[in-house]
Amino acid sequence: MVSPPGVLSSLLLLAAMAGGSSQQCSEGRTYSDAIISPNPETIRIMRVSQTFSVGDCTAACCDLLTCDLAWWFEGSCYLVKCMRSENCEPRTTGPIRSYLTFVRRPVQRPGQLLDYGDMMLSRGSPSGAWGDSLEDLRKDLPFLGKDGGPEETTEYSDEYKDLERGLLQPSNQQDPRGSAEYPDWSLLPSNEGGFNATATGDNSAASMEKLQDPTPHPLDQEQLQALNESTWSPTPGHSSISSVWPSSASPLPTEEGLEGEETLQLQEQPSNSSGKEVPMPSHNPSPASLESSPATTEKNSNFTVTPRSRKHSTPTFPTSTVLTGLTPPPWPLSPTASRTVKALAVSAGDNLVLTLPDREAELKASVEPAPPADTTYSYEWSLMSHPVDFQGKIKQENKPTLHLSQLSVGLYAFRVAVSSENAFGEGYVNVTVMPAARVNQPPVAVVSPQTQELSVPLTSALIDGSQSTDDTEIVSYHWEEVDGPFLGEEFPADTPILRLSNLVPGNYTFRLTITDSDGATNSTTASLVIRDAVDYPPVANAGPNQTITLPQNTIILNGNQSSDDHQIVLYEWFAGPGGESKEMVMQGAQTPYLHLSELQEGEYTFQLMVTDSSGQQSTALVAVTVQAENNQAPVAVAGPDKELVFPVQSATLDGSRSSDDHGIVCYHWEHIRGPSAVEMENVDKAIATVTGLQVGIYHFRLTVRDQQGLSSTSTLTVAVKKENNSPPRAQAGGRHVLILPNNSITLDGSRSTDDRGIVSYLWIRDGQSPAAGDVIGGSDHRAALQLTNLVEGVYTFHLLVTDSQGASDSDAATVEVLPDPKKDGLVELILQVGVEQLTEQQKETLVRQLAVLLNVLDSDVKVLKIQAHTDVSTVIVFYVQSGSPFKVLRAAAVARNLHKRLSKEKEAFLLFKVLRVDTAGCLLKCSGHGHCDPITKRCICSQLWMENLIQRYMWDGESNCEWSVFYVAALALTLTLLTGAVSWLCICCCRRRKRTKIRKKTKYTILDSMDEQERMELRPKYGIKHRSTEHNSSLMVSESEFESDQDTLFSRERMERGVLKGSLNGCARNGVSFGYYSKDR
């Protein structure tokens, strides 16, 4: 949270003017390896960031008028304000980097500035710290105990000397802890004292009442002189302020100070921080900072100060309040030319507090002393802070009186600057606009129902009071029993709904009292009547009177309509008066149903007596009338007259609509009149056929007879005419487009026309159309053809219409069935449950479980079809959509994800056991070298192609046809040859190694001299040169223990040698030396 901008501007001005008075501040006693007892009730501590040395910390304490002690602890700077001298007594501690430096100030401080600065910085947390709570201090100062004092420390002895100057040398190291844990020492004070309260939200009124921004007193001559020594240096695009800050008593220049002006960076205080922020001093200002031109100074809503280090970013002000830049004095300031300015006591009046709907205010500035006769004061009003939504009007900004209108809720800070040629003064005032006060409306208690009547065994009831209303909030409900039987101590009294149980008969009255958040109450009552159980006698009902006609002599009387408030335990049927002597058979006389048979003509009366569980009885009578058999003559109906057009092959005579009360047993057709004789078939049946009709009028008579011999006749006229007939015109309906999964359609041929009417329709499927698809209810012989279960493809149906004269016409209708656009996203889930056992509620539960597994919404899982897979399994076809607009996810990815999630979950995660999860259609591309089997969902590869076994069994497991049989065979042959070659090479190497082993020394003897051409050289088997000398003989024999020929090798030397090599005994003229030559290998 951030303080109001008005307080920020006042604090900036205070810091600028404090620079003049702090020039007399000097460094006092210093202590090393020492701490103080930071009791929050006696001292106040503020942590300062962006300090690089003990000297910086001491200078910061000098710059703050309320600071008494600069504490440098472990690379961090803390400013301490001591209420009393004994509160800041140094104490010794262990070998840690802790230095205490007391500052010396003049006895006479500027009273106005001191009071104002103390008040500005003392409005902190109740703990007494300027910005750091006790918990935050414990993070920085680990030696603090729970009471806030040091642990195991002793008082500092007088033998401690002043701190060496080397400790005051600047350090370029920055506090490694940063601003994440500690609030930075910046220009913005905390909100806990009321400086950061905003005028928005529900709590604005409470926060505004705490905020009282005082107006500073008139400046004395010394303070104005210090103000004249300050400089105003504009920054491009912003209004910035640079002040000459005094250093400590013995300032040590830092590297940053030598390079240029050191200024402070404005940093925004985090909202959860309770610390205040104080401006960081700048030392050794450069001459450039002392130059300013008022002509280049402009107003801006943002205050920017050059950062001390480029490593820190420049934060921004909060958006809840808008700051207006400070306006520099109207006269030019120069560090080399000082002038005397008279201080004016300017008052902008008391702080104003307005409450909506009051949106106007008037601010008036008063100045002391009054202007001389020849001089007038210039007034300049500036709005330093206002709410973000401020759109009001400000009038007469350059006059003593400022008119404000159309103010919105929030805090406004105004500054008025009064100046003349040699005088200057300024004042501040706050205007707070509070929201309109709310008028509380009392709550309205509502109970439902207000009246209830129950009868035993119902002994429980509910009374709902949750429908009660209030303009804010109902905080409590209280039920109490006003009248009725006592309910005991377990009576639920503080719930919106009153639940009652185990009630006894009686009249109850309950009162509900509700209370809202403002303490207003309202009550209402509800009544409840519990009645005792009443046992009413049963009501017997034997049913209505019955009448039957012989030969029917059986009937069933039904008494199950009898009723009782509890239960009927006994049914009894009796023959009524006048029926005891008649013969009949009664069955089920003690059941609700009485079966009567062998009844005779006459009237019967039967009595039903019912008995309930308490023994109460009731009776009812029913009459059964048996009438004598009454035969009526049949009625012959030959049908309507017919008019036929010649030529006609045959005509149908229909007498099936003839009727009789007992049934017709005989039909007879006869030709009674006509132009020529005709041939008739089935003349003794209800429907007869006539052929051989010629042009003329024919009369046929139908005679029917019943079982009693009664008969009846009817005549039919058939007129055969010769006239022209126009053929019908068939219209099948044209072309239709159907998109799966919608696989049903109706083709309408009723628009076919004929001059005398169409008598028959016939739909014929074209031979090139798909065979799949069913005709519903024989509609292929009707005007409208109904089709279902169509598959992807183009269907052609021919409509053949025929009129009464046999003329016909045909037309074709085309149905193009397009594939389902969601086909690639359909997933097939087979569950171990019969399709007849799967209910709608279980289906919705399955959808929710699938949505949880797939991490989607329930509405994203769409079930298209549920059908039987086997007698004990059901297949569910669904797809999953996501995104906006909706996009159907790929079935392969959904099936793979669902299979993976099911393998990780418990076995009983779904309602039923999952038998298989796969795509509904076969979507495999098979690498373009095969096709996908729709049953097994596996690729069937073409000839000379096979499956990539590595991808199938080691990677994603998707069936494919990526490998060529030739390539695989060539690779296998290559690997086989390579394996054989490597094996052969290894065997050869092993044998060679075995042959090179040194054998036992072999002895040789010289053979007899032989012909020079048969000279041979005897050599060891493995080429090892013998140590024996050369001999002249050409042949040598071994005398070793092994006489085998396998131990010696003979090689024939070439007859001629260029140069004979010498041996130990010299050269032999007729022989060569015995040795090893690599070429003999």
UniProtKB/Swiss-Prot annotation:
The chain crosses the membrane at residues 965-985. Residues 345-436, 444-533, 539-629, 630-723, 729-820 form the PKD domain. Residues 236-255 have a biased composition (Low complexity). The modification Phosphoserine is found at S1009. A motif (Endocytosis signal) lies at residues 1004-1007. N-glycosylated. GO terms for biological process: central nervous system neuron development; multicellular organismal response to stress; negative regulation of axon extension; negative regulation of axon extension involved in regeneration; negative regulation of dendrite development; neuron migration; positive regulation of SMAD protein signal transduction; response to auditory stimulus. Pfam families: K319L-like_PKD, KIAA0319, KIAA0319_N. Residues 1-22 form the signal peptide. One of its GO terms (cellular component) is early endosome membrane. Residues 168-331 are annotated as: Disordered. Residues 197-206, 222-234, 283-307, 314-324 have a biased composition (Polar residues). The keyword Transmembrane applies. InterPro entries: Ig-like_fold, KIAA0319-like, KIAA0319-like_C, MANSC_dom, MANSC_N, PKD/Chitinase_dom, PKD_dom, PKD_dom_sf. Residues 23-964 are extracellular. Involved in neuronal migration during development of the cerebral neocortex. May function in a cell autonomous and a non-cell autonomous manner and play a role in appropriate adhesion between migrating neurons and radial glial fibers. May also regulate growth and differentiation of dendrites. Homodimer. Interacts with AP2M1; required for clathrin-mediated endocytosis. This is Dyslexia-associated protein KIAA0319 homolog. It comes from Mus musculus (Mouse). The lineage of its organism: Eukaryota, Metazoa, Chordata, Craniata, Vertebrata.
